[in-house]
Amino acid sequence: MFDWLFEHGDGVSVLTDIGTLIVWVVYAQLLYFSFRRQRRPRLLINRGRKKDIDALCIISNMSAEPVFIQHVVAELETSHGVVRVDVTDRTESYQDGDENRDQDASNSSSESSPIVRDGSHQGPLEPGGFVHIDSFDALTRRLAHDGGFEMEGHQPQQGVVFHSLTVRIICIYGSEDLPIGAERCFEFIDRQPGCGLVPATWDTKRLASWWQRRRLCREIIQLNDKDDLSTLRTSRS
């Protein structure tokens, strides 16, 4: 055996080097995939407390690092078109005697949601943390109001049909230059006398590819321009 190894030493040495190279390549791949998994942002959008339209819309950060929630966008797809609203900030309509009730509601929301500050969901979200942005019913009513749709209970009036509600979050992750995002679509189902809401997909869609992040940049610019225009109109009125 030793004579055979001595005679074929060069070939054995080459095979040994190739085997060692393969082991190191596999080891490097494992390290790379482990590093990428730890660095990959992971955000979830789910229903909480209930399973119908009264459920809370919960955003969870399952990433290894904190994320900064910059925008929360909701899109209501209807038979009369799509309504898109930036719901990052809460809006309240005041009537006589509403000040105390809204203050109590604000305090309650602040206790149950870790980010709400001065009526805004914008801010950092720690790893393993979560925040609820509102109930799906409240989001639907807010978008219906902005779209000019009349509501009776959970149902739209005047022949309007609600098809789906999509929630999209735009965040800054760690030291990344471009934003990352996540979105999930929920479909309305007729469940008399109320209204049901079920996820259209089993998981939250991650928006982290290069072209998706560039699209999020353009959306941020559009949202900021819209905010500037609203501020200008308010100051002139």
Predicted ranges, named:
Residues F2-S34:
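Membrane-embedded hydrophobic alpha-helical segments
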Residues A28-D52:
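Transmembrane-cytosolic junction motif
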Residues N46-G48, T88, F136, I170, ...:
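A structural detector for beta-sheet-dominated domains
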Residues R49-L56, I133:
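Contiguous beta-strand segments within globular domains
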Residues I53, V67-Q70, G129, V161-L165:
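Residues at beta-strand starts and edge strands
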Residues I58-S63:
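Asparagine-centered strand-capping/turn motif at beta-strand->loop junctions
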Residues P66-M151:
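Structured domain cores in non-transmembrane regions
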Residues G147-S237:
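Glycine-rich, aromatic-bearing surface loops/beta-hairpins
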